[in-house]
Amino acid sequence: MDPLNATGMDAFTAIHLNASWSADSGYSLAAIASIAALVSFLILFTVVGNILVVIAVLTSRALKAPQNLFLVSLATADILVATLVMPFSLANELMGYWYFGKVWCGIYLALDVLFCTSSIVHLCAISLDRYWSVTQAVEYNLKRTPKRVKCIIVIVWLISAFISSPPLLSIDSNNYISSQPQCMLNDDTWYILSSSMASFFAPCLIMILVYIRIYQVAKTRTRSMSGKEPRPDGVTQTENGLNKANSPCHGDRENGHCQCPPTPSQRTVTIGQQTDDADMDESFSSEGKGHKPQRQDSQRAKRPGLKKSSISKQSARISRVSNKSVDLFASRRKRRRSSIAEKKVSQAREKRFTFVLAVVMGVFVVCWFPFFFSYSLHAVCRDYCKIPDTLFKFFWIGYCNSSLNPAIYTIFNRDFRRAFQKILCKSWKKSF
């Protein structure tokens, strides 16, 4: 009888079954209790952390970018690992045999391969998305709509399902001959090598090569931008953002001042002056341009009131035109500065996102490489090299990876950190 159905049995029988269970698994009762507690905490942490990731992306404005849907799908895969794979792996590990039947064994193995493959294919798709966003920034950002990202996610899951389908057809039936059946993948060399290559090594190689290329492109752009930043000696920037060296003074100097080409606002004022002069029958002249005939002076002397009112009207018109020009120039400069600031914020966010994903990919490779390496080594030299059975426990390190992504987002990304704090504070306030 299974220990799980020990309800109503006397204490002696329960202790006896626990002792036999301990003997089958090779663990002591204390070790079984410790492992069960540790893995249970890992499952809970994985589920809660990845649910927070999903809620954060779907509710936070700072995380509304379409590419973050990849993280939602990746978090979903990690949640499914924690709920549909890890509990049965824990039971199989502690009991020492597979209790749940042959049919569920095939489904369990297929789901295990599916979610592992899905995680790395997601990371591969994310690396390609990063590469295209870096090399084809304008064109690709216009194409990268939520609908397009969702289509890519569906393709990722279909590829993962295709790779993970063989376990349903290739379960080793010899594992069920003994009284204590084992749930293991097909042990044939061809299957081990092909599944390892398709599920891990090939996507991992693509991912690493793409990120190396992203690093090279980013480094080249940084060098080119740093080469453009230095200004020539003697060049200063005026308040309106124009370089003095780019607007040289020319012509003769008058009264110690240099005659420079008029700025747009100055041109507008000049036009207003010309219009007013025409309205006043050219009664005014610029300073230093000579004198009009004496007859005009006598006419102006006869009309002092007209002269004062005309001067005030002209000054008002010039002031209005000048103010409009200054306001227009200031608004354009403000819009230009705001667009530049938005662009810098967007670029900084893209850089942070790329760095975080690089950390996620690196941690994934570190967690899963030991298992796939030992698994493939067993297929290649099973007759010549003895691999300890403990090496096949490395898949637990791979399972731990499912719980690490939320922690990585929290540590390395400010937007995720703020979103998590907001979600937790809201739930904390609602609970009181």
From Swiss-Prot:
Enumerate the Cytoplasmic topological stretches. Answer: 58-69, 129-149, 213-356, 414-432
Per the UniProt entry, the disulfide pairs are 105-183
Q: Which GO terms describe its molecular function?
A: alpha2-adrenergic receptor activity; epinephrine binding
The UniProt entry lists membrane topology as:
Multi-pass membrane protein
Keyword DNA-binding carried by entry: no
Q: Where in the sequence does UniProt note compositional bias of the Polar residues kind? A: 235-246, 265-275, 309-319
- Give the record's GO biological process terms: platelet activation; regulation of smooth muscle contraction; regulation of vasoconstriction
| Xref: InterPro entries | ADR_fam (IPR002233), ADRA2C_rcpt (IPR000735), GPCR_Rhodpsn (IPR000276), GPCR_Rhodpsn_7TM (IPR017452)
Q: Which residues are glycosylated?
A: 5, 18
Q: Does the keyword Transferase apply?
A: no
Q: Which family does it belong to?
A: Belongs to the G-protein coupled receptor 1 family.
Name of the protein described by the UniProt record: Alpha-2 adrenergic receptor
User: Which organism encodes this protein?
Assistant: Labrus ossifagus
